[in-house]
Curated annotation (Swiss-Prot):
It is an enzyme of class 2 (transferase). PROSITE patterns: UDPGT. GO terms for biological process: cytokinin metabolic process; protein glycosylation. Belongs to the UDP-glycosyltransferase family. Coiled coil: none annotated. Its EC number is 2.4.2.40. Disulfide bonds: none annotated. This is Zeatin O-xylosyltransferase. PANTHER family: GLYCOSYLTRANSFERASE. InterPro entries: UDP_glucos_trans, UDP_glycos_trans_CS. It comes from Phaseolus vulgaris. It catalyses: zeatin + UDP-alpha-D-xylose = O-beta-D-xylosylzeatin + UDP + H(+). It holds the Pfam family UDPGT.
Length: 454
C-alpha cells in the first residue's frame, strides 16, 4: 500500500503459522481496520492462503503480505504423539520471515509517523529487528488464556506464594508440550523484553483475576484484555448463500438437544479411541454432530490425501437421524450459535473455549496438549461451565465408551447439566454486555486504539 504524508499509524500483524493463531490475528486485524487504521498481515504464502480460506469475514481492508520461505517437509499427523510435532518443520520454516519482515518494517517506518507491530508471542525472534527503528512500537499478542500465561510466569518464578491470590491446581507446562517445543519457547522468551506491552484475546469478565495477575507480573508494561475477538453474531449462510448441510439438520432438532463434538485442527486420535468415541456417542442416545477429520499438516495444500477414519461397521446407518458425522471443515461458530446446540465436547483450544463461552454453550472437556489442560481447568473448576470427559492425569489412557457415554448424558440430560448450562448462559450475557457501548471490553479496546493512535 502506498502511504502518504498524512498517514499517522500503520499496524503490522505477525501470527504464528497454525490455524489457532492465524484466525484470532485476522479477527484482531478486522477490528483495528474498522477504526480506519491501515492494517498489514504477514505470513508465508501457504499460511496466508490458509488464513483467507478459513476466515468468515471480508478481508478487503487488510493488506496481506505473503512471503516465500524455503521448502519444508509436511509429514502427516501421528496419533501416537502427545504433541503435534509434525508441525514443527513449518514453525522452523517461518523463522525465515525475519528478513522480509525487517524490510517491510523499514519501508513502512519511513512513510508513517508510527508503526505498531503486533507479533505472536511465538514469533518474537522473527520480530526482533523492530528494535532497529525508532518509530516502531512492538506489542506481543498472546493467543492463550490469561490463566495459562499467568501460570507460565508463576511456574518460571518457582510458584511462590501470592498475596491475596490462590491459583487453581493447574498442570505443569512440562507435561503439556514436547521437549523440542520447550526449547523453542525458551528461545522466543529471550526476545519478549523488547515489547511495549501485551495483548490478550480474553475479557476481564471471563478472566479478570488472571489479567490483574499478569499486570503484576509484567514489570510495568501495559496489559490489554481486548477480547473475545470472536463475532457475537454469525450468519447461517456464507456470502454466496451457501448453508452447510449440518445447519439444515440442526434446524430440525429441539432446542439445546445436540452435543457438538470437535477436537480442533492439531489433534489426531488413535483408531481405537475413535471406535470408543463412536460407541459412547451411540450408547448415549443423545443427538450429536461429530466433526471427524484428521489434524492439519504444516502445509494443508500439499496435495496429499488426509487420513479417513474408520467407524464401527454400520455406525452411520444406526445413528441416522440421531447423529451426523462431518468429515470436512465445519462451520463451528454457526453450529455453536444455533439454538439446537446444547453442549460442546472439545479439546479446549482457547479459540474453541471463547466461541463456546460467548454463545453460552456448556463444555465437555477433553484436553490434548499445550494450553488445553489449563483451559479445561478454567472451564470446569473456575468458571464452572463445563465437566470433564478425560482427566489430564489419565492422558495416556484410552477413554472408554462408557466414560464418554456417561459424560454426554451428564451434560445433556441431568440436573447437573442444566445447572452448568444456566451458568454458561449467564456468563454469555455478561460477556455480551461487556462488549456493548460502555462495557469493560469495549472500553479496553477503545483504550488500546487511542494508545496506538495518539
Amino acid at each position: 500500500m502506498a502511504l502518504n504524508d498524512e498517514t499517522k499509524v500503520v499496524v503490522l500483524l505477525l501470527p504464528f503459522p497454525v490455524q489457532g493463531h492465524l484466525n484470532p490475528f485476522l479477527q484482531l486485524s478486522h477490528l483495528i481496520a474498522a477504526q480506519n487504521i491501515a492494517v498489514h498481515y504477514v505470513g508465508t504464502v501457504t499460511h496466508i492462503r490458509q488464513a483467507k480460506l478459513r476466515y468468515h469475514n471480508a478481508t478487503s481492508n487488510i493488506h496481506f503480505h505473503a512471503f516465500e520461505v524455503p521448502p519444508y517437509v509436511s509429514p502427516p499427523p501421528n496419533p501416537e504423539d502427545d504433541f503435534p510435532s509434525h508441525l514443527i518443520p513449518s514453525f522452523e520454516a517461518s523463522a525465515h520471515l525475519r528478513e522480509p519482515v525487517g524490510k517491510l518494517l523499514q519501508s513502512l517506518s519511513s512513510q508513517a509517523k508510527r508503526v505498531v507491530l503486533i507479533n505472536d508471542s511465538l514469533m518474537a525472534s522473527v520480530a526482533q529487528d523492530a528494535a532497529n527503528f525508532s518509530n516502531v512500537e512492538r506489542y506481543c499478542f498472546q493467543v492463550f488464556s490469561a490463566l495459562n500465561t499467568a501460570g507460565d510466569f508463576w511456574e518460571q518464578m518457582g510458584k511462590p506464594p501470592l498475596a491475596d491470590f490462590h491459583f487453581p491446581d493447574i498442570p505443569s507446562l512440562q507435561g503439556c508440550i514436547s521437549a523440542q517445543f520447550t526449547d523453542f519457547l525458551t528461545a522466543q522468551n529471550e526476545f519478549r523484553k523488547f515489547n511495549n506491552g501485551d495483548i490478550y484475546n480474553t475479557s476481564r469478565v471471563i478472566e479478570g483475576p488472571y489479567v490483574e495477575l499478569l499486570e503484576r507480573f509484567n514489570g510495568g508494561k501495559e496489559v490489554w484484555a481486548l477480547g473475545p475477538f470472536t463475532p457475537l453474531a454469525v450468519e447461517k449462510k456464507d456470502s454466496i448463500g451457501f448453508s452447510h448441510p449440518c445447519m439444515e439438520w440442526l434446524d430440525k432438532q429441539e432446542p439445546s438437544s445436540v452435543i457438538y463434538v470437535s477436537f480442533g485442527t492439531t489433534t489426531a486420535l488413535r483408531d481405537e479411541q475413535i471406535q470408543e468415541l463412536a460407541t459412547g456417542l451411540e450408547q448415549s442416545k443423545q443427538k450429536f454432530i461429530w466433526v471427524l477429520r484428521d489434524a492439519d499438516k504444516g502445509d494443508i495444500f500439499d496435495g496429499s490425501e488426509a487420513k479417513r477414519y474408520e467407524l464401527p461397521e454400520g455406525f452411520e446407518e444406526r445413528v441416522e437421524g440421531m447423529g451426523l458425522v462431518v468429515r470436512d471443515w465445519a462451520p463451528q461458530m454457526e453450529i455453536l450459535s444455533h439454538s439446537s446446540t446444547g453442549g460442546f465436547m472439545s479439546h479446549c483450544g482457547w479459540n474453541s473455549c471463547l466461541e463456546s463461552l460467548t454463545r453460552g454453550v456448556p463444555m465437555a472437556t477433553w484436553a490434548m496438549h499445550s494450553d488445553q489442560p489449563r483451559n479445561a481447568v478454567l472451564v470446569t473448576d473456575v468458571l464452572k461451565v463445563g465437566l470433564i470427559v478425560k482427566d489430564w492425569e489419565q492422558r495416556k489412557s484410552l477413554v472408554s465408551a462408557s466414560v464418554i457415554e456417561n459424560a454426554v448424558r451428564r451434560l445433556m440430560e441431568t440436573k447437573e447439566g442444566d445447572e452448568i448450562r444456566k451458568r454458561a448462559v449467564k456468563l454469555k450475557d455478561e460477556i455480551h454486555r461487556s462488549m456493548d457501548e460502555g462495557g469493560v471490553s469495549r472500553m479496553e479496546m477503545a483504550s488500546f486504539i487511542a494508545h496506538i493512535s495518539r
